[in-house]
Amino acid sequence: MRFTILFSLILSLPVSPAVIAGQGQIEFSAVIDQSMPQQEPRESKIYIGDGRMRTDITVNGKTMIQIVDMKQQTAYMLDPAGQSYMVRKAGPGEVMPGGASVAAKDANPCAGMQNLGCTRLGVEDVNGRPAEKWEMVNTSPGQSGKMIVWLDQERRIPVRQSLPDGSTMEMHLIGRETLNGRDTEKWEMTVTRPGGQKYVVEQWFDPALKMNIREERPGGFVSEFRNIKVGKQPADLFTVPSDYKEVSIPQGGGAEAGQGGEH
């Protein structure tokens, strides 16, 4: 069975599992529309539950499902056609704040996360907004590194980041807009690469949902939530069916999982 292509598409969705690691996350479901030049529009479905997130995506008639359980720090990739699944640990990089609100004011954003430690360095002004400055250290084998994150004290989103490779990110609040009937804040994110190259991403943050519901990236990439339905999500959406068989993750992220080839 071939997991890799569809798995990469799910990872490209504008939702980080960080969204479900925060305090008081609202449960809801939504459709995500994605479009980019010279490619067919893509539609996926997302479900946000109690500390868990599920994403369904169909490409060329093949559906894949990803379930992330942040309480257990575990991610599952399901192949309904083959009735099989892969399982892995949800790494620190997946639960760092990014486009989603995190812990309550002054709370340690790394609390409960394996191989990730945070040290509070104080409060600084970032584009006119008070932000907590945190040092985050990843101690995972082969992935050690340190980054500095400034968390907006009101929204609990990262408004500035300094990454180990020298890249930086900075957010600036543009204003407030109504999008699909929901009150949002429009933010402009500027990313600077180590060589000095810059690009800008526009994001529409929904304070009630504590996450972005629209994003526009360079090159014409647009992603937007629609048909948002707030409410308790069924627990069985976030469990692996008992008749599914576990297969191994391919070495080096190869195209095939397990030993049986493509189903």
Predicted features along the sequence, with ranges:
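An acidic-aromatic
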Residues: 46-104, 111, 122-163, 169, ...
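Extreme N-terminus nucleophile/cap motif
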Residues: 24-52, 57
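Beta-strand-rich interaction surfaces with strong enrichment in secreted/lumenal proteins
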Residues: 43-44, 121-123, 174-176
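Bacterial N-terminal signal peptides
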Residues: 4-16
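Non-transmembrane domains of secretory- and envelope-associated proteins
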Residues: 20-26, 35-37, 81, 126-131, ...
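Generic short beta-strand segments
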Residues: 31-35, 58, 135-139, 188-192
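Short secondary-structure junctions
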Residues: 117-122, 246-247
